[in-house]
Design a protein with these regions (language model features):
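Glycosyltransferases and closely related glycan-assembly transferases
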Residues: 43-45, 73, 125-134, 141-157, ...
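Nucleotide-activated donor-dependent transferases that construct or modify glycoconjugates
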Residues: 45-59, 83-84
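Active-site donor-binding segments of glycosyltransferases and PAPS-dependent sulfotransferases
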Residues: 74-142
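Short amphipathic alpha-helix
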Residues: 64-74
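Helix N-cap/beta->alpha junction signal
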Residues: 139-140, 158, 207-208
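Active-site proximal beta-strand in glycosyltransferases
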Residues: 134-137, 147-176, 224
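Helix-loop-beta element that forms the nucleotide-linked donor phosphate-binding surface
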Residues: 204-206, 210-230
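Membrane-proximal helix-turn-helix segments that form the acceptor-binding/catalytic region
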Residues: 171-203, 211
Length: 233
């Protein structure tokens, strides 16, 4: 089965009840989760589109972006929702797509250095409204937390490395104001990430190591594996 065939037959799932989500998150985050559940209302957008595509950011040329291109080929009329988009930094084929970005995209520095926005990207993602009945989601840590109107299908490249493997992800930039702020906000960011992950019942991993990582981080078992395409052709 090709990725296109998988996407066109994908088992889209609706969001779980917030109380059920709260029951699934780690015990260490439950107190913070109850506060968020009480004081942070979730207002879903109204569905005005049949299908959409969501991805963290389109600023480079990598495997995750190839997957989004495959999604675009499967659903060529579907708009792509993403936090940041740099036409010169990613694959030129995206210029044919309808791409909708967050307000952060107006800051050119962040388009070229998305890691500098790490502490605020999850919150910006929460305000990314995707008004579609169905959404195919490609994520490494942000797009699964967009505000979806309808059902979604999650193709996970990895749980958020910037959160669970931050030193490895940041590399030489593991010191400074951004990593310090990231560590300070870590409990709130972990709650946001688990809340986003557990609102979707079905995940697909792109490799066996990612399947194991999803199980370790989110407690999701029996996640199916579907390998990503190796080229944009």
């Amino acid at each position: 089965m090709s990725l296109t065939q998988l996407l066109t037959s994908a088992p889209f799932t609706g969001p779980k009840n917030p109380d059920a989500v709260l029951a699934d998150i780690p015990k260490s985050l439950k107190k913070l989760g109850r506060l968020a559940r009480r004081y942070v209302p979730l207002v879903k957008p109204e569905a005005t589109e049949e299908i959409a595509i969501a991805h963290d950011y389109l600023t480079q040329r990598g495997g995750a972006e190839r997957v989004v291109l495959a999604m675009h080929r499967a659903f060529p009329d579907a708009p792509i929702y993403t936090t940041l988009y740099d036409p010169e930094g990613t694959f030129p084929e995206f210029k044919d797509a309808k791409i909708i970005t967050s307000p952060l995209n107006k800051i050119g520095y962040l388009r070229r250095n998305h890691r500098m926005a790490l502490p605020i990207l999850p919150f910006a993602s929460s305000f990314m409204k995707v008004p579609a009945e169905r959404t195919v989601v490609s994520t490494t840590g942000w797009a699964h937390g967009f505000n979806f109107a309808g059902r979604k299908f999650i193709y996970c490249h990895s749980p958020a490395r910037w959160l669970y493997l931050s030193d490895q992800y940041l590399g030489e930039k593991s010191t400074g104001p951004v990593p310090l702020l990231l560590k300070t906000l870590r409990p709130a960011l972990m709650l946001w990430d688990h809340w986003a992950a557990h609102r979707s019942a079905v995940y697909v991993a792109n490799a066996s190591v990612i399947k194991k990582r999803i199980e370790n981080v989110y407690g999701k078992k029996d996640v199916p594996i579907f390998f990503p395409p190796h080229s944009v052709d």
